[in-house]
Design a protein with these regions (language model features):
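Short, Lys/Arg-rich flexible segments
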Residues: 1-84, 92-93, 98-143
Length: 143
Protein backbone atom coordinates (compact mmCIF):
# COMPACT_ATOMS: atom_id res chain seq x y z
CA UNK A 1 0.00 0.00 0.00
CA UNK A 2 1.26 3.48 -0.77
CA UNK A 3 2.29 5.64 2.14
CA UNK A 4 1.80 9.40 2.20
CA UNK A 5 2.93 11.70 4.97
CA UNK A 6 1.85 15.32 5.10
CA UNK A 7 3.34 17.84 7.52
CA UNK A 8 1.07 20.40 9.16
CA UNK A 9 1.87 24.14 9.01
CA UNK A 10 2.53 26.13 12.20
CA UNK A 11 -0.89 27.85 12.27
CA UNK A 12 -2.51 24.40 12.28
CA UNK A 13 -0.40 23.40 15.24
CA UNK A 14 -1.32 26.57 17.16
CA UNK A 15 -5.05 25.99 16.60
CA UNK A 16 -4.72 22.36 17.62
CA UNK A 17 -2.87 23.25 20.81
CA UNK A 18 -5.82 25.47 21.83
CA UNK A 19 -8.29 22.60 21.54
CA UNK A 20 -7.23 20.87 24.73
CA UNK A 21 -9.44 17.91 25.63
CA UNK A 22 -11.42 18.18 22.38
CA UNK A 23 -8.36 17.42 20.28
CA UNK A 24 -9.11 13.75 19.53
CA UNK A 25 -12.64 14.30 18.23
CA UNK A 26 -11.61 17.35 16.20
CA UNK A 27 -8.59 15.52 14.76
CA UNK A 28 -10.85 12.67 13.64
CA UNK A 29 -13.21 15.10 11.89
CA UNK A 30 -10.38 17.00 10.20
CA UNK A 31 -8.63 13.84 9.01
CA UNK A 32 -11.93 12.46 7.72
CA UNK A 33 -12.46 15.64 5.66
CA UNK A 34 -8.99 15.40 4.13
CA UNK A 35 -9.29 11.66 3.56
CA UNK A 36 -12.54 12.06 1.64
CA UNK A 37 -10.84 14.45 -0.80
CA UNK A 38 -7.96 12.04 -1.43
CA UNK A 39 -10.32 9.04 -1.68
CA UNK A 40 -12.40 10.78 -4.34
CA UNK A 41 -9.28 11.51 -6.43
CA UNK A 42 -7.91 7.96 -6.04
CA UNK A 43 -11.28 6.49 -7.10
CA UNK A 44 -11.44 8.66 -10.21
CA UNK A 45 -7.83 7.81 -11.13
CA UNK A 46 -8.45 4.09 -10.58
CA UNK A 47 -11.58 4.18 -12.73
CA UNK A 48 -9.67 5.84 -15.54
CA UNK A 49 -6.79 3.31 -15.61
CA UNK A 50 -8.67 0.02 -15.21
CA UNK A 51 -9.13 -1.67 -18.56
CA UNK A 52 -7.21 1.02 -20.47
CA UNK A 53 -4.45 0.04 -22.88
CA UNK A 54 -4.89 -3.74 -22.73
CA UNK A 55 -4.17 -6.17 -25.54
CA UNK A 56 -7.26 -8.22 -24.78
CA UNK A 57 -10.79 -7.36 -23.69
CA UNK A 58 -10.83 -6.19 -20.07
CA UNK A 59 -12.05 -8.65 -17.42
CA UNK A 60 -12.65 -5.95 -14.83
CA UNK A 61 -15.47 -6.76 -12.40
CA UNK A 62 -15.47 -3.51 -10.44
CA UNK A 63 -14.54 -5.36 -7.27
CA UNK A 64 -11.26 -3.48 -6.86
CA UNK A 65 -12.99 -0.11 -7.15
CA UNK A 66 -15.68 -1.24 -4.72
CA UNK A 67 -13.08 -2.32 -2.18
CA UNK A 68 -11.40 1.09 -2.12
CA UNK A 69 -12.21 2.97 1.06
CA UNK A 70 -11.12 5.04 4.01
CA UNK A 71 -10.00 3.61 7.35
CA UNK A 72 -11.22 5.11 10.60
CA UNK A 73 -8.89 7.66 12.16
CA UNK A 74 -6.49 6.00 14.62
CA UNK A 75 -3.46 6.92 16.66
CA UNK A 76 -0.28 5.20 15.51
CA UNK A 77 2.54 3.97 17.73
CA UNK A 78 4.32 7.33 17.49
CA UNK A 79 1.29 9.10 18.97
CA UNK A 80 0.21 10.70 15.68
CA UNK A 81 -3.33 10.48 14.35
CA UNK A 82 -3.62 9.03 10.87
CA UNK A 83 -6.16 7.85 8.35
CA UNK A 84 -5.52 5.54 5.42
CA UNK A 85 -6.91 5.17 1.92
CA UNK A 86 -6.76 1.51 0.98
CA UNK A 87 -8.49 -1.65 -0.15
CA UNK A 88 -10.71 -3.97 1.86
CA UNK A 89 -9.48 -7.55 1.88
CA UNK A 90 -9.93 -10.29 0.72
CA UNK A 91 -11.54 -10.47 -2.71
CA UNK A 92 -14.46 -12.81 -3.35
CA UNK A 93 -12.12 -15.12 -5.29
CA UNK A 94 -9.69 -15.27 -2.35
CA UNK A 95 -7.06 -13.05 -3.96
CA UNK A 96 -5.64 -9.82 -2.64
CA UNK A 97 -6.91 -6.40 -3.70
CA UNK A 98 -3.63 -4.82 -2.59
CA UNK A 99 -1.72 -7.18 -4.92
CA UNK A 100 -3.89 -6.22 -7.90
CA UNK A 101 -3.56 -2.52 -7.07
CA UNK A 102 0.22 -2.93 -6.86
CA UNK A 103 0.32 -4.61 -10.28
CA UNK A 104 -1.76 -1.81 -11.79
CA UNK A 105 0.31 0.92 -10.10
CA UNK A 106 3.78 -0.46 -10.91
CA UNK A 107 3.14 -2.95 -13.73
CA UNK A 108 4.72 -6.35 -14.26
CA UNK A 109 6.50 -8.19 -17.03
CA UNK A 110 4.44 -7.63 -20.15
CA UNK A 111 2.08 -5.17 -18.46
CA UNK A 112 3.06 -1.51 -18.29
CA UNK A 113 2.54 0.52 -15.13
CA UNK A 114 -0.63 2.59 -14.90
CA UNK A 115 -0.07 4.73 -11.81
CA UNK A 116 -3.17 5.94 -10.00
CA UNK A 117 -2.10 6.34 -6.35
CA UNK A 118 0.94 8.59 -6.71
CA UNK A 119 -0.73 11.01 -9.16
CA UNK A 120 -3.74 11.18 -6.83
CA UNK A 121 -1.47 12.02 -3.90
CA UNK A 122 0.23 14.88 -5.71
CA UNK A 123 -2.93 16.20 -7.40
CA UNK A 124 -5.07 16.24 -4.27
CA UNK A 125 -2.47 17.62 -1.86
CA UNK A 126 -3.55 21.27 -1.88
CA UNK A 127 -7.26 20.43 -2.04
CA UNK A 128 -6.79 18.11 0.94
CA UNK A 129 -5.01 20.81 2.94
CA UNK A 130 -7.78 23.29 2.11
CA UNK A 131 -10.52 20.85 3.15
CA UNK A 132 -8.72 20.05 6.39
CA UNK A 133 -8.18 23.75 7.14
CA UNK A 134 -11.86 24.48 6.53
CA UNK A 135 -12.93 21.56 8.74
CA UNK A 136 -10.56 22.67 11.50
CA UNK A 137 -11.86 26.24 11.38
CA UNK A 138 -15.45 24.96 11.59
CA UNK A 139 -14.65 22.71 14.54
CA UNK A 140 -12.73 25.44 16.38
CA UNK A 141 -15.63 27.83 15.72
CA UNK A 142 -18.08 25.38 17.33
CA UNK A 143 -16.14 25.33 20.61
Amino acid sequence: MAKAEMKMPEDFLLKISKLGSYFDSVADTVLQAGGEVVLKKVKSNLSSVIGRGTKFKSRATGELEGALGLSPSKMNRDGNHDIKVGFAEPRSDGGSNAKLANIIEYGKHGQPAKPFLKPAKTASRQECIDAMTKALDEEVGKL
